[in-house]
């Protein structure tokens, strides 16, 4: 049982550290938690506690992730930090830890490195909306010109991947000094500057209930004398009795009216995000609706078959494929509640994809699925997960 009640007085925001190995992501995570705990309450975290990240499973993929909480004057943050590069790739692609914003940690002594670039690219592909930069290890750089040069390089890199490089907050500091209790500009002051940037630069995310109505169809029943009932968990928004809704995906889009909302055998006048409900649909036949479609606010989402995605292919040890796959590989793509077959086109410079790789692919599905950029999917072969992905760009 939870020991204390979660106080929902402050808005909640999800963030995480990204960046090259050994640039100080975990040290910074510990420093933020420690400095903010002293200022606003909460639990300080030691480096070792964060570094020993527990294993979790997301979509059948094992990921090591550490979760840390902290508060500022205005907000409550949940922060994720991963020990290894592969964990970041998996985490970002599966959306196991959705980030409202990321803190890119870059060592001032080394400047941007290959994983700095790769994490920015991943953030772009998977739809992380905001990046703040913490230029770490500034205590090791005496030359102000060198610092300026590194800052310029980071801004250029962000702009290259369509983040607003020129307007991105860059905080200079030393996570190590801050963690050791240094009260100076590069220590505690830098952490407070970072907290301020988090509060001001990352907007408060829209709550699921404020989104436009969407519910993936899980099951369909026919109730004699009442009509067709569709069950599922409302992903976002609200549906009220009497509202017009659309059935999208797999078949041509049709409109219908919700004439009843039922939860735990009780009739309600509305259902909202997070509710497991049955919706009664007027004049809709049982065979008109199937698992894998979605119910939504009319016009809010369209069905598509052609898209680019960023995918992670499970390694053999993770229960994935034992062999590589090539161009025109045809697995099943599992979106929300159903599998749809599709063919994969690899980038020109990529002859094959090995188990354990991550890669950008182009996919053509044999049936349209209600999708938008940022939608997660699993790649399966005969019901077994062999990969995970996210829709980066819709092409049709």
Swiss-Prot record:
GO molecular function, one term: guanosine tetraphosphate binding
Its job: GTP hydrolase that promotes the GTP-dependent binding of aminoacyl-tRNA to the A-site of ribosomes during protein biosynthesis.
Segments for region (G1): 19-26
CDD domains according to UniProt: EF_Tu, EFTU_II, EFTU_III
PROSITE patterns: G_TR_1 (PS00301), G_TR_2 (PS51722)
Protein's cellular compartments: Cytoplasm
Higher taxonomy: Bacteria, Pseudomonadati, Pseudomonadota, Betaproteobacteria, Burkholderiales
Keyword Secreted among UniProt keywords: no
UniProt-annotated stretches for the region G5: 174-176
Alphabetical keyword list: Cytoplasm, Elongation factor, GTP-binding, Hydrolase, Magnesium, Metal-binding, Nucleotide-binding, Protein biosynthesis
Protein name: Elongation factor Tu
Complexes and interactors: Monomer.
């Amino acid at each position: 049982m939870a020991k204390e009640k979660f106080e929902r007085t402050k808005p909640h925001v999800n963030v995480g550290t990204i960046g090259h190995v050994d640039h100080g992501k975990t040290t910074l995570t510990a420093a933020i938690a420690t400095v903010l705990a002293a200022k606003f309450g909460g639990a300080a975290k030691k480096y070792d506690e964060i570094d020993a990240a527990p294993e979790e499973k997301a979509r059948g993929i094992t990921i090591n992730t550490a979760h840390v909480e902290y508060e500022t004057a205005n907000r409550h943050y949940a922060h994720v930090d991963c020990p290894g590069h592969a964990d970041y790739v998996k985490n970002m692609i599966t959306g196991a830890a959705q980030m409202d914003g990321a803190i890119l940690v870059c060592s001032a002594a080394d400047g941007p490195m290959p994983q700095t670039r790769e994490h920015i690219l991943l953030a772009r592909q998977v739809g992380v909306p905001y990046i703040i930069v913490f230029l770490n290890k500034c205590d090791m750089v005496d030359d102000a010109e060198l610092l300026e040069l590194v800052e310029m390089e980071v801004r250029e890199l962000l702009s290259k991947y369509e983040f607003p490089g020129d307007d991105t907050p860059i905080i200079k500091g030393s996570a190590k000094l801050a963690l050791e209790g240094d009260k100076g500009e590069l220590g505690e002051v830098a952490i407070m500057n970072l907290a301020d940037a988090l509060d001001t630069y990352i907007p408060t995310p829209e709550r699921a209930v404020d989104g436009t109505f969407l519910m993936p169809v899980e099951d369909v029943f026919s109730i004699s004398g009442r009509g067709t009932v569709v069950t599922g968990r409302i992903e976002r928004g609200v549906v009220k009795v009497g509202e017009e809704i659309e059935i999208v995906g797999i078949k041509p889009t049709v409109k219908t009216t919700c004439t009843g909302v039922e939860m735990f055998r009780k009739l309600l006048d509305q259902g909202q995000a997070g509710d497991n409900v049955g919706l009664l649909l007027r004049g809709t036949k049982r065979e008109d609706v199937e698992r894998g479609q979605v119910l939504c606010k009319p016009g809010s989402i369209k069905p598509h078959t052609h898209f680019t995605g960023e995918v992670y292919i499970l390694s053999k040890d993770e229960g994935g494929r034992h062999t590589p796959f090539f161009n025109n590989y045809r697995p099943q793509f599992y979106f929300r509640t159903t599998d749809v077959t599709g063919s994969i086109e690899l980038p020109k410079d990529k002859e094959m994809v090995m188990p354990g790789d991550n890669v950008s692919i182009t996919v053509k599905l044999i049936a349209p699925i209600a999708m938008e950029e940022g939608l997660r999917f699993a790649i399966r072969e005969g019901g077994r997960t062999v990969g995970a992905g996210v829709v980066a760009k819709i092409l049709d």
